[in-house]
Structure formats: C-alpha cells, structure tokens
From Swiss-Prot:
Spans annotated as Interaction with host AP3D1: 12-19
Region listing for Interaction with membrane phosphatidylinositol 4,5-bisphosphate, in residue ranges: 73-77
Motif extent (Nuclear export signal): 16-22
Organism this protein belongs to: Human immunodeficiency virus type 1 group M subtype F1 (isolate 93BR020) (HIV-1)
UniProt entry keywords in alphabetical sequence: AIDS, Capsid protein, Host cell membrane, Host cytoplasm, Host endosome, Host membrane, Host nucleus, Host-virus interaction, Lipoprotein, Membrane, Metal-binding, Methylation, Myristate, Phosphoprotein, Repeat, RNA-binding, Viral budding, Viral budding via the host ESCRT complexes, Viral nucleoprotein, Viral release from host cell, Virion, Zinc, Zinc-finger
Region (PPIA/CYPA-binding loop): 213-221
Protein name according to UniProt: Gag polyprotein
Lineage per the UniProt record: Viruses, Riboviria, Pararnavirae, Artverviricota, Revtraviricetes
Record motif PTAP/PSAP motif, residues: 450-453
Amino acid sequence: MGARASVLSGGKLDAWEKIRLRPGGKKKYRLKHLVWASRELERFALDPGLLETSEGCRKIIGQLQPSLQTGSEELKSLYNTIAVLYYVHQKVEVKDTKEALEKLEEEQNKGRQKTQQATAEKGVSQNYPIVQNLQGQMVHQSLSPRTLNAWVKVIEEKAFSPEVIPMFSALSEGATPQDLNTMLNTVGGHQAAMQMLKDTINEEAAEWDRLHPTQAGPIPPGQIREPRGSDIAGTTSTLQEQIQWMTGNPPVPVGEMYKRWIILGLNKIVRMYSPVGILDIRQGPKEPFRDYVDRFFKTLRAEQATQEVKGWMTDTLLVQNANPDCKTILKALGPGATLEEMMTACQGVGGPSHKARVLAEAMSQATNTAIMMQKSNFKGQRRIVKCFNCGKEGHIAKNCRAPRKKGCWKCGREGHQMKDCTERQANFLGKIWPSNKGRPGNFIQNRPEPSAPPAESFRFGEETTPSPKQEQKDEGLYPPLASLKSLFGNDP
C-alpha cells in the first residue's frame, strides 16, 4: 500500500484532501481513493505509475474517454478521479469533481479548435485522390489497380443489376472526371449499355451549356475559366484544370457533377436490364416469404420513383402479391406491421412442415364435422321403443317390471308364442289380406276384363250415338261418384 499511496505527498496531498467528491457535499478525496484508482488501472491493464505525473494522467484520460458512453459506473468513477488528480499535478485549484470535469472539457475544446485552425492554414485538401505533397502543391493520385479490378468484377458478375450503382458511387469517391472515364473505359462488354450512358452524358452536358452560357470578354488574370459541359465530362479539359476547379476558392466540383451524370445514366441502364416491373413480382405457392421479399426489394431498387412512392409500394404491393397462405397471416398483423414482424410471422410458410400442419388441421376439422353429422343423424333416426308386455313406451319387454303377460302377445291366446302365431293382421281397411274372395275391396268388383283390343273406326267425321243397351251397361259398371260403394264395393 505504501507504493500505491506515494502518488502524492506534501502540499499536493493536502490539496487533494481539500477537494469535495460532489458540489456542496461533505465527503472529500482521501488517500484510499488513490489506492483504489491504482488497483482499477491494473484491472484495465494500464500502468499505475502513470498516476505520478500530469502527463501520465493525460494519457490515461485519453484511453478512458472513448469508453465513457458505454462504460460501467466504475469506469466513470475512475475517469473522474484521474481528472481531479490531473489538476492537482497541474497545481490548478478546483473545489470539486464537477469543476474539474468542466475545466477538462474546456481545455479539450480549445485544443480541437487549434488543430482545426492549423489544418485550415496549411490548406490541406480533403478531396481524395487529390492530395497535397510535401512542397504544398496539389497533386493527383491515380486510381489503384485494385479499385479498377473491383469495378470490373462487379460488372462481370452483376451486369447492371441495381447494386452496381452504390458500388460505383463508393469506388469513385472524390475521383476526377479523368478517373471516372478510366473506370468507364475498363468495361469491355455491354457496349449497348455504354452507348446509352454516353447519350445521357451528352444530354446533361448540353443542358449544362444551356444554363451556363460562356462569358463574353477575356478572363481576368489569376482566374480560371468556367467549365463547359465537355470539360466536366473530361473530354476537353486537362487533369491540371480539373484539379484547379476542384481545389479552387470557391471550388467547382466537376468530379461530383460528372459522377451524378453517370449515375443518372446507370439508372436508365439498370431499368433496361431489369424488365420485370414491381407489379409483376408475386410470391409462388411454395416460395419462402424471405426469397419473395428479396426479389421484391431488388426490383423496387431499380424503380425510378420517389421515396414516398416506393414506401407506398412496399406497404401495399408486398402484402397484395403474397401467396394466399402468407396473405392471410399478413392481413391478420394489420397495416402497421414492420418488415421484421412480417418475416417472423411468415417464417416457414410454404415449407413441408407448414403444409403438413395445414393438412392436419383440415383433416381434423373434416373429422369433427363428420362426427357431428353422424351424431345429428342418429338423433333424428332414433325411434320410440314399445313394450309388448305392458304396452307402454320407453322400454322393451326384456326390461319390463310389470307381471309377464301369458299367451301370445299378438292375439292374446295361450298355447303359442307371437313368432308362431297364425293370426293374420288386418290391413288399413280392416280386412284380412290376402282375401279368398278375389279382388281386394278397394278395387272395382264387376269390371269385365277385355279379351281383345277394341275395333278401330274408319268412319271419319261421323258421330256415333251410343245404344240404350250400352248406356245401361255403363251405368252398371260406373255408378255415381257420390256413392262410396263404387270405391269399396261390398265394404260395410
């Protein structure tokens, strides 16, 4: 402990013990805080010996400061302790920890301002690949072969898919028109697309010349001429002129302007190489929802529309063009669902497990429906049983509690059972059937059966008058309908 406590001594230790932990608080810094700080530095793999000097404390502060936002409370307490110790070494009077932190922040801000001012006085350019050499001159660094190789590889693998545009923008950061032309000239194939790109560049250059006419008269000494459309495209300007425009005061960003023209042409080419519109992107019956979303957003990337329109397409068409299984789930989520919620809800839809689950649910519902129908049919077909012994309903003779009836249950006579009964039942007319008297009572009794078909009459247009004998015979066969005897014969 003695070695760790030897960080401060004499007047510095007295000044240390006068500083309060919090503004207006009673607790003050003690020797134990230095011992704790030494142990914490060892835990963070830092040298505790740095606490003995102000320069060492500054180095520790530089190491700890980037981790303050994500660090623990112990780390923040260690940072505060080192800040107070730094001003004790500097012999700057502070009353508490808060005042020490405010002074440290003020000192760091002044240091940043001095650094920025020195950088501005030197005139160091931020335009890469245009840099300043040791003599203070602005020089150009050509694109590296690795950058060109990456660009060519993208064109060969992706052709002109939507991801080519951000790749071109990243590789051409800070490039001059000459660098951009070098990148375009390295594209070997796709000459039809390159010709479309040239046409777009020429149109934009002509529009630039129309909006920025040439100034009349000579150019004042010490000034550079205004760039024309062909100068921006790098066809009529030298590399030195391009550097002067890009680093002048005020600068003319010819590289960025030419880059925007190229990206405009690339958008048209991407549109041509992606003939499928966003309206044609539909999810297949067995296609996973994730693959469908990938195709949807890849096509949406090539659409020439504003961000608001693309947002509407995402909210509407993504759900509308999904397959029925996913569409049911997405509609249940509601219109405010995020893409993450959609992906999670539709995960596995369309796969074998989902199909098996849907089929099992359908079969279960069909089985339940069939069981319910069978139950309902049995309920409708249930008939009322009647006891042959007592004649009451609700039970059968086997379970009847009444005294057993003697004799036949059909005719009531003893000596035989119902199955051996010879007594015939009467029909609904009260007669025993079959009858020994010929025709049943509900048939016409005296009608003669014809033995031959009737003779045909060949006298056309003549009216035949029935004979009196025939009339009497017909009256005998067909009595008046008012008599029930005509229907039932000799029935009583």
